[in-house]
């Protein structure tokens, strides 16, 4: 209820930067891993 509650920070940019970093690295990684796994099954 108080604006100084540490459990509810108003530092949204921190979470935004973290979200961008996780998805920028995570989405392509999962995509390439899936593509490599698919190629392995296709060749066999």
UniProtKB/Swiss-Prot annotation:
Return the PROSITE patterns for the record: CYTOCHROME_B559 (PS00537)
InterPro entries listed in its UniProt record: PSII_cyt_b559_bsu (IPR006241), PSII_cyt_b559_CS (IPR006216), PSII_cyt_b559_N (IPR013081)
Question: Where along the chain is heme bound?
Answer: 23
Which Gene Ontology BP terms does the record give? photosynthetic electron transport chain
The alphabetized UniProt keywords are: Electron transport, Heme, Iron, Membrane, Metal-binding, Photosynthesis, Photosystem II, Thylakoid, Transmembrane, Transmembrane helix, Transport
Signal peptide span: none
What are the protein's GO molecular function terms?
electron transfer activity; heme binding; iron ion binding
Q: Look up and give the membrane topology term.
A: Single-pass membrane protein
| Complex and partners | Heterodimer of an alpha subunit and a beta subunit. PSII is composed of 1 copy each of membrane proteins PsbA, PsbB, PsbC, PsbD, PsbE, PsbF, PsbH, PsbI, PsbJ, PsbK, PsbL, PsbM, PsbT, PsbX, PsbY, PsbZ, Psb30/Ycf12, peripheral proteins PsbO, CyanoQ (PsbQ), PsbU, PsbV and a large number of cofactors. It forms dimeric complexes.
For this entry, the protein name equals Cytochrome b559 subunit beta
User: What organism does the record attribute this protein to?
Assistant: Trichodesmium erythraeum (strain IMS101)
Gene behind the chain: psbF
